[in-house]
A protein has these predicted regions:
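Bacterial N-terminal signal peptides that target proteins for export
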Residues: 1-11
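Short amphipathic alpha-helical segments with coiled-coil-like heptad repeat character
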Residues: 4, 260-264, 445, 518-521
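C-terminal region of N-terminal signal peptides and the immediate post-cleavage residues
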Residues: 18-35
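Extracytoplasmic copper-binding redox domains, predominantly the cupredoxin/blue-copper superfamily
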Residues: 373-524
């Protein structure tokens, strides 16, 4: 599939590419063995939740839809919105959804330490409906329910793919769906559900927040509960939704980033508040919550909750805070909801089945390989002082002084006098290559992965140095309350200064976007 210029106003404003879907949707191919994803490992630890793969709904056919090919440039960390062309050619019902990302050259899922699917959100008529992070949770409607599909719908894809390497690559984003044509006998009696998007940051293109090391209580930080100013200046509390019709909730899942422990869905009525479901992050790696080697628990097929108009639904998320700080993280819980009431447990008088299951086993591409000895990086604690400097320039994915990958004088830690600060300047393409200066524990010189380095050193972080567009969402997305928000992770600046109150010593840092980049400076 090739990409053409997106004719809609948002795309024109952002300068993004798109594959335009004409009024007639393209025929999507049925899934063949050659196109099927690699088998998933089901090797789980003894304490893991059970894996429960939902059977395909009667009459459903599995189709693999692809978007691309997309060229992911070296160091890329951008958000784009594209129109989707490859879709079912007839009206019908979607009963299952399995996301993925594959390389063009070999149809294999790339290791997360090389190409990272930060997020992909499939929007139907501007409403977030299906989504994926690196954990790639499978989504299946409970028996008898489905998402309605028509060829008249506008389907868009909001996606963000990190290239953690200095070399380009090409990928497809994939969406494997179970689809029942509207005229099939099995389509009779299907009950329509839609997706209610619950996010601790509300509806934003980049809905993130930061978790500081040591924040919260007993090594855990609950957002927004532990952030009194979480929504300061916002017109409403972003993590809440007032239910606008009597309905039945029929499923939900959670999404967190490394460091995340769970998400919680809550319901309030008449001064009472109950928990509807906790989506737990199960980390397959024994190292725990420091990587994308994770699966999120989902509700069981029998989970049904009756809600009433005027109820208040909300979402919270919990992160650990002993291992490190966690920057630009998320807490999201999409919820399947009916258009009319269809039974279910009243959570204030009955018992909701809150037991969760995993939708799949361990994903080979998410197994982390970082944290091993790396002879290509120096130990800055053993190096002599470099020169006194007042600035460090970042260019070609390297620091001009104190870069641990350099063996020359330029590899020695830059020196700054106590009470002064160092200025970091990003001289890589400021609209496409963003860098951070994030403190890590010295010597911070092992191989890069997702679980290494961590933000476990001095508590400083520059944000992503670079520039990106902003957009008025209020007129584009239903229920958005943002007038002007950034579309990318860029901090809207290319410079940052170290804190002036750092004590004497050697400080190591890395780039969160490109973790192979390491540097050091000394305060004397």
């Amino acid at each position: 599939m090739t990409a053409r210029r997106c004719p809609i106003a948002l795309a024109a404003a952002l300068g993004i590419s798109a594959a335009f879907a004409a009024t007639a949707a393209a025929q999507a191919p049925a899934l063949s063995s050659a196109m099927a994803p690699a088998p998933l490992s089901a090797r789980l630890s003894a304490d893991a939740p059970p894996v429960q793969v939902a059977p395909r709904a009667p009459g459903a056919k599995t189709m693999l839809l692809k978007y691309g090919p997309m060229t992911i440039k070296p160091g890329q960390n951008l958000i784009a919105v594209d129109l989707l062309k490859e879709r079912p050619a007839v009206d019908g019902w979607i009963t299952g959804f399995r996301p993925g990302m594959i390389r063009v050259k070999d149809a294999a899922s790339p290791p997360v330490s090389q190409l990272h699917l930060h997020h992909a959100v499939w929007l139907v008529d501007w409403v977030p409906t299906f989504a994926s992070g690196e954990e790639k949770t499978w989504i299946d409607a409970s028996p008898g329910y489905a998402w309605k599909y028509t060829t008249r719908q506008h389907w868009l894809l909001n996606h963000m793919i990190h290239n953690l390497t200095p070399t380009p690559d090409q990928v497809y984003l994939t969406m494997e769906i179970d689809f029942i044509p509207a005229d099939a006998p099995e389509a009779q009696g299907i009950k329509e559900i839609t997706t209610r998007w619950m996010d601790v940051q509300g509806l934003k293109p980049y809905p993130v927040f930061d978790v500081k090391r040591g924040a919260g209580k007993n090594g855990k930080y609950v957002y927004p509960d532990d952030a009194p100013d979480a929504y300061k200046g916002a017109p409403r509390v972003r993590n809440r939704w007032v239910v606008d019709h009597d309905a039945t909730l029929v499923g939900t899942i959670g999404h967190v980033h490394p460091g995340g422990l769970n998400t919680d869905l809550w319901l309030e009525r008449g001064g009472k508040k109950v928990n509807l479901f906790r989506s737990d992050a199960h980390y397959f790696d024994p190292a725990g919550p420091i990587s994308w080697d994770v699966g999120m628990t989902v509700t069981r097929p029998e989970w049904k909750v009756a809600v009433k108009k005027g109820d208040v639904m909300s979402v919270t998320t919990t992160y650990e805070t002993r291992r490190g700080a966690w920057y630009e993280v998320m807490g999201i819980m999409p919820v399947g909801i009916t258009k009319t009431p269809d039974g279910g447990v009243d959570p204030f008088t009955g018992q909701v089945d809150r037991r969760g299951v995993l939708s799949h086993g361990r994903l080979p591409e998410n197994i982390d390989s970082g944290g091993k000895p790396n002879p290509g990086l120096s130990n800055p604690l053993r190096l002599r002082d470099g020169p006194y400097v007042d600035r460090i320039v970042i260019k070609n994915f390297a620091f001009d002084q104190g870069d641990l990958s350099r063996s020359s004088r330029a590899g020695r830690p830059a020196v700054v006098a106590r009470g002064k600060s160092l200025l970091f300047v990003n001289r890589d393409p400021e609209l496409t290559v963003f860098h951070t200066i994030t403190g890590c524990k010295a010597p911070c010189n092992k191989t890069a992965g997702i679980g290494f380095p961590l933000a476990d050193g001095a508590p400083f972080d520059s944000g992503e140095l670079g520039y990106g567009p902003v957009v008025n969402l209020d007129s584009l997305i239903k229920d958005s309350d943002d007038e002007r928000v950034p579309i990318t992770a860029a901090a809207q600046r290319t410079t940052w200064r170290t804190p002036k109150n750092l004590n004497r010593g050697t400080y190591t840092y890395f780039c969160r976007v490109h973790p192979f980049m390491r540097g050091a400076f000394r305060v004397k």
